[in-house]
Amino acid sequence: MTDSEYLAKNYLTADPSPPTDRPKKKRKKTKAAEVESQGLIIADDDPPDLRSTATLSSKENDEYGPVVTGARSAEFRKTKKSNWKTIGSSTNTGTDTATATGPNAGRDEADAILADAMAEEDARRAAGDEDPMVVDQDDNEDDGGLRMESGARAGLQTAEQTAAMVAAQQKKRKAEEAQYKGKQGHAQETIYRDASGRIINVAMKRAEARRLEEEKLIKEAEAKEALMGDVQRAERESRRAALEEAKVMPLARTADDEELNEELKAQTRWNDPAAQFLTKSTGGGRSKTGKPLYKGAFQPNRYGIRPGHRWDGVDRSNGFEKEWFAARNKKERMQALEYEWQMDE
C-alpha cells in the first residue's frame, strides 16, 4: 500500500459521486501517470561541492534529504466538507452558537452597533470636538483655499464658520484701509525684489553705486596725473596759489602794480629780442622743480620746457615738435597771405 492510498483511506473523506446513466470512458494509463501516482522527487541540481552541509544526506540530518510528495487523489479533490475540528471549551461554544443562531440575532447585533455609535457621537458632542473652530489668522496668513468676495471659503460651511470668515475679511480690509490713510500711506516705501524674490535694499544699492562712481572718477584723475610731468604739476600749483591770492586782491590792476610787473619780467621768452640787453639774470639757471638747466641753444617745444644741464645737444625725438611748429607757422603765414590778397583786390 502506497502513502497516498494510506492517507486517502484513514484521513480523507469524499461524498459519493451521483450515479449517472452515461457509461464512463476508460482512460489509458501511461507511464507518466504511473510516475505521478507514485510521487515526485525534488532534488538540487547544484553540484556536490556547492551544496551546503544542511542539504547533504547523512545520519545526523536525514530530514534534509530528498522529499517525496504524494499525489493528490481524486477523492480529496472532490470533497466539499472541511475535516478540521475546533478544540475549545464546550460551554463557550454552546453559548456563542445559541447567540448566533437565534431568530433575532442579526437584529440585536445591529441595534447594539447603532447604540454604540450613538453613544460615541454624544460623547464627542459633549466634549466639544465637532464645534466650529474659529481661528484668528494674521493679515498675511491664508489657508490657500478658494474664497468668495465676502471672505467666506467656497464649499459647504456651517453658519458659525461663514460668519467668522466674513468678520475676519472685514477686519483685514479695515486694517488695510487704515494703513493707507493719513501719514502712514505717504511714509511707505516701494519694495523692490530680484528674480528670486528677495527684497532689494534700494538705499544700500544707491550708496554702492555712488561709491563705485567716486572710485571711477578717482582712478581717472590718477591716470591723468600720471601723464603729467613735474613742470606741469608745478604750474598747476602756481595757478592754484594765484587763485587763492586773487581772493584778497583788488578788482582792478593797473600798470603801476609792482607784483604784476615783477612776475612779467621773470618770464623767459625764447624769441625775446631784448633779453640780451638784460644785465641781471632772472632764470637763475634752475627749473621750477629746482634742478639745473641747459644753458645752450635747444629746439623749442610747445610746453616751453628747457632740457636739463646733462643734455648733450643731440635731438633724439621723433620730430613731432618740429613738425608741429612748422604746421603752425604755415597756417599763420597762409592766413596772412589770404588777408593781403583780399586787401589787394
Swiss-Prot record:
Q: GO biological process annotations for this chain's record?
A: mRNA splicing, via spliceosome
Q: Give yes or no: UniProt keyword Secreted.
A: no
Function, please?
Involved in pre-mRNA splicing.
GO cellular component terms, A-Z: cytoplasm; U2-type spliceosomal complex
* Subunit text: Associated with the spliceosome.
Mainly localized where? cytoplasm
Which species expresses this protein natively? Emericella nidulans (strain FGSC A4 / ATCC 38163 / CBS 112.46 / NRRL 194 / M139) (Aspergillus nidulans)
Q: What domain of life is recorded for the organism?
A: Eukaryota
- Homology family: Belongs to the CWC26 family.
Identification of the protein by name:
Pre-mRNA-splicing factor cwc26
Q: Where is this region: Disordered?
A: 1-106, 120-148, 265-314
Q: Which residues cross the membrane?
A: none
Q: Where is the composition biased (Low complexity)?
A: 91-105
The Acidic residues compositionally biased stretches are: 129-143
Q: Keyword set for this entry?
A: Coiled coil, Cytoplasm, mRNA processing, mRNA splicing, Nucleus, Spliceosome
Subcellular localization is given as: Cytoplasm; Nucleus
The residues forming a coiled coil are 157-244
